[in-house]
A protein has these predicted regions:
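Flexible helix-coil transition and linker loops at the boundaries of alpha-helical arrays
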Residues: 114-124, 183-194
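Short acidic-aromatic linear motifs embedded in glycine-rich loops, typified by GG[WY][YF]DAGD(H)
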Residues: 1-129, 133, 138-144, 148-154, ...
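Amphipathic alpha-helical protein-interaction segments enriched in hydrophobic
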Residues: 194-205
């Protein structure tokens, strides 16, 4: 029940395809934004909104915890990561990435639940994109945390999701990505505007999963990794001839840069600002 008459409930919010596109954008936004309205205010419980952005902290977790990246900032979470020493206080990076990934899962589940009975033209594609974004979030959770809670759109509201184990989660993600690749709903490479996901993103995610399959499941999948990588390249990707162009503001318009991007997280000056992404890299 809405708190006031101007608030929409789920039955009112989704009426047209544009409504569903806005709902899908809400899922995409969880990868790049600190909140819906203000990059200086996070919608998760952190001390610093800038430290809550997913791409920023995913990079930090992967690179700063080894010798690939060093930072002289005095933030406690940075010191812990660079020295691989941990305290009882939750680390800002591990907390942000975990919470943001679970936020993607939650938003995608709600979107899929609310769109399951609709029959609008174009909606199956939006649902396929939501399924990929959810599968990719589960991939990050499996890779970094091992055995996260597993929830789907069918889960009863308020019920605690169960943990199915790392191997079972790997198998679910693999099956979900293969289903998206075999179906017609997820767009082909080049069929949708930058940075919407395509089958290239699903194929590349499979390749990344197979590279580390022995850690996730106990069984190596080297040939599958090679096959998936080659299949991705054959979808039309190529290296940008000028490496610097990959970091320009016109990625959505630069054909050379777009040839190299497989799954991009969008930032721009006007609509999707945050203290993450490349802003963090150059600050």
């Amino acid at each position: 029940m809405p708190l006031n008459e101007t608030d929409k409930n789920a039955g009112q919010a989704y009426q047209t395809l544009e409504d569903y596109e806005m709902g899908l954008a809400y899922i995409y936004g969880a990868y790049s934004l600190a909140s819906q309205n203000d990059p200086g205010k996070a919608d998760i419980a952190v001390d610093d909104a800038g430290q809550s952005e997913l791409v920023r902290q995913y990079m930090v977790l992967n690179e700063m915890s080894v010798d690939a990246l060093k930072c002289t900032w005095g933030d406690s979470y940075i010191v812990e990561l660079q020295n691989n020493s941990w305290s009882a206080t939750p680390n800002a990076s591990t907390l942000a990435v975990y919470t943001r990934c679970m936020m993607v899962v939650t938003r995608a589940n709600e979107f899929l639940k609310q769109s399951s009975a609709a029959s609008l033209e174009g909606l199956p594609q939006l649902r396929a994109e939501a399924r990929f974004l959810r599968a990719f979030a589960y991939y990050l959770l499996m890779d970094l945390y091992g055995n996260p809670p597993f929830a789907m759109e069918e889960n009863v509201a308020g019920a605690l999701p169960s943990q199915i184990g790392r191997k079972a989660l790997f198998e679910w993600i693999e099956g979900e990505l293969k289903d998206l690749l075999e179906g017609s709903e997820l767009p082909e490479v080049g069929a949708v505007p930058y940075p919407r996901v395509t089958k290239g993103a699903a194929q590349a995610t499979l390749a990344r999963m197979y590279l580390n399959a022995e850690v996730y499941t106990g069984t190596a999948r080297w040939q599958d990794a090679l096959d998936a990588a080659e299949a991705t390249i054959k979808m039309g990707y190529d290296l940008c001839p000028n490496y610097e162009e990959l970091f320009m503001q016109d990625n959505s318009e630069n054909d050379n840069a777009r040839k190299e991007f497989i799954f991009a997280i969008a930032y721009d000056r006007d609509n999707s600002q945050s203290w993450g992404g490349t802003t963090h890299l150059v600050s």
